[in-house]
């Protein structure tokens, strides 16, 4: 991981009530974007973007070094999921990034004023800088809607081998709902 390197690839698959869309960004000399969508206006689109930080990659950057050069970023490509669900143009948008320490946590805020959108990521202030929660707020027509998530438990396991019903009790230890309940 070099100081100036970016994620090699980011993808998003979004299913809406009336169709689905898939988006992929490949990091080459420029960012190569491919969009495949159910919607005619955005179906099978390809575009090139100048190198820019992607919100999809900041989650990893925060885990590696939360006090990196992230705070110097002035424009960023919002999450691919957000762009698809809100039908926004794929480009880097102005962003104000701030960090503050609260007890043993670090809260990083990404404020996209031109999009009326804010993302807050709360993580441990010490290594391994685990992400504890996040919150996304979007204002539309004067109403703010907030989505949030909080880690309840964690476990290290070979999850790719634990995909049979006999492993369902592991969901309890992670405080996840059981299937069919």
What are these regions (language model features)?
Residues 25-73:
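Surface-exposed beta-loop interaction hotspot
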Residues 1-30, 68-181:
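Acidic, serine/threonine-rich low-complexity disordered tracts
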